[in-house]
Amino acid sequence: MEIKDEETTAEVAMVVQSRFRRVCVFCGSSHGKKKIYQDAAIELGKELVARNIDLVYGGGSVGLMGLVSQAVHNGGRHVIGVIPKTLMPREISGETVGEVKAVSDMHQRKAEMARQSDAFIALPGGYGTLEELLEVIAWAQLGIHDKPVGLLNVDGYYNPLLSFIDKAVEEGFIRPSARHIIVLAPTPKELIEKLEEYSPQHEKVVSKMKWEMEQMSYPQNYDIPRPKEGKMIIEAQRGSRLWM
């Protein structure tokens, strides 16, 4: 009886408790030329499973997207794929895993992925991956969300991007504190450990609460009056836009 209790205790101890329920992974619809990229996608999926974290991703079954989603699904965790209807024939090959949410366009895809997730991780990818990554970084800087953003820098893949960001800081286009929005690591285990400990240190442009309040109060159709002649001024005290 004591041996059985010890085994049960050991099994419980192996379960890693995470602060995240779901993590969004951005990655390519291609495998890349190096096997190390594919290995990293599978390893990331297994690391999410080990921490009882569900996956939110771009919904494709090809490339790194297919590998990470299959690894999470095989491990028994829930998978949510968000994909525009137009991209389904291109990015879905064979059976999909988990739940697939079809949306109308790329804007809705990114918004839904962000809404469903507690953190973001970027694997190697192309233009689409970069766009998704940079948008959630920009949202963090603006104060729209306070979720961690992680960069899985497999084999130094993102070193040129990091050099560009450092150059932008040096030239005064990005605040030094905003450089730390990006959490960086070469392996999935190390990256998720860093994300678990992440706390925003950068100065936000606007508070998250302000964004949420504006979103709730903003009318669906808001027309700014535009007379034929005149110029717009901003009346700061009232927060209204006027033309004179």
Curated annotation (Swiss-Prot):
Q: Where along the chain is substrate bound? A: 91, 109-110, 126-132
Which reaction(s) are listed as its catalytic activity? N(6)-(dimethylallyl)adenosine 5'-phosphate + H2O = N(6)-dimethylallyladenine + D-ribose 5-phosphate; 9-ribosyl-trans-zeatin 5'-phosphate + H2O = trans-zeatin + D-ribose 5-phosphate
Q: Which EC main class describes this enzyme? A: hydrolase
Per the record, a Pfam family? Lysine_decarbox
Record keywords, A-Z? Cytokinin biosynthesis, Hydrolase
Annotated family: Belongs to the LOG family.
Q: Which domain of life is it from?
A: Eukaryota
Gene of origin? LOGL2
GO cellular component term, pick one: nucleus
Name of the protein in question: Probable cytokinin riboside 5'-monophosphate phosphoribohydrolase LOGL2
One BP annotation, GO? cytokinin biosynthetic process
Task: Tell me which EC number(s) this protein carries.
Answer: 3.2.2.n1
Write one Gene Ontology MF term: cytokinin riboside 5'-monophosphate phosphoribohydrolase activity
**Does the keyword Hydrolase feature in the UniProt annotation?**
yes
Source organism of this protein record: Oryza sativa subsp. japonica (Rice)
| Role | Cytokinin-activating enzyme working in the direct activation pathway. Phosphoribohydrolase that converts inactive cytokinin nucleotides to the biologically active free-base forms.
Q: Which InterPro entries match?
A: LOG, LOG_fam
**Taxonomic lineage per UniProt?**
Eukaryota, Viridiplantae, Streptophyta, Embryophyta, Tracheophyta
